[in-house]
Amino acid sequence: MRIGILGGTFDPIHYGHIRPAIEVKHALALDKILLMPNHIPPHKQQPNLTTAQRLKMVADVCSQLDGFELCDIEAKRDTPSYTVVTLEQLKSLHPEHELFFIMGMDSFLQLKSWYEWQRLFDFAHLVVCQRPGWQLDAAHPMQQILTARSHAHQETHEGHAKNTHKNSGQIFPVTITPQDISSTQIREQLAKGEIPVDLLMPVTLDYIQNQQLYLP
């Protein structure tokens, strides 16, 4: 089974998370996507909502999307959510599956600052989402890694990637539709009493309004 993994604070989860994940799922013919809320994100300040509230929002979204599941493996931890630890744990639980960890190009460019980043490739492939026409500068330090591990996939009529012989360790660049949406933007709108109907799934907006979340 080919499993995509998208982690994040999801404070709140919005179309800027969901639409790229759907595009990646189709582009790489993934069997499912795990949406994985962080508990204590190492690179971010503490979230505005509780872990339970963010889990509820993500679970609601997954119930509306075919092939999407909530993964609470990081939310159950009392320690920071280091990706390499999570992937190692997921791989030990599902050694027969191919894991595809999804990230944006901005995160990929900062990869060397991640905890034990080299070991990520022992457990999963990386999927690097990029904007149409975007190219990494040839002199950038990450270009060598991208080139060495990049898997130029050729899609069949079913959209399945050919020639994937390795169970982990490759990089799959995927061009996605740009989404100019941020959780900060949504929280600010909600605090002003605005209703961002175009940025959130209806099930998420209903939960936020019913629970009166993100109010000043």
UniProtKB/Swiss-Prot annotation:
Top-rank taxon: Bacteria
InterPro entries assigned to the protein according to its UniProt record, in alphabetical order: Cyt_trans-like (IPR004821), NadD/NMNAT (IPR005248), Rossmann-like_a/b/a_fold (IPR014729)
GO aspect biological process, one term: NAD biosynthetic process
The enzyme's E.C. designation: 2.7.7.18
A Gene Ontology molecular function term of the record: nicotinate-nucleotide adenylyltransferase activity
Catalyzed chemical reaction(s): nicotinate beta-D-ribonucleotide + ATP + H(+) = deamido-NAD(+) + diphosphate
Top EC class for this record: transferase
Keywords carried by this UniProt record: ATP-binding, NAD, Nucleotide-binding, Nucleotidyltransferase, Pyridine nucleotide biosynthesis, Transferase
Pathway listed: Cofactor biosynthesis; NAD(+) biosynthesis; deamido-NAD(+) from nicotinate D-ribonucleotide: step 1/1
CDD domains: NMNAT
Family under the similarity heading: Belongs to the NadD family.
Task of the protein: Catalyzes the reversible adenylation of nicotinate mononucleotide (NaMN) to nicotinic acid adenine dinucleotide (NaAD).
HAMAP family linked: NaMN_adenylyltr
Protein name according to UniProt: Probable nicotinate-nucleotide adenylyltransferase
Organism listed in the record: Shewanella baltica (strain OS195)
Gene expressing this chain: nadD
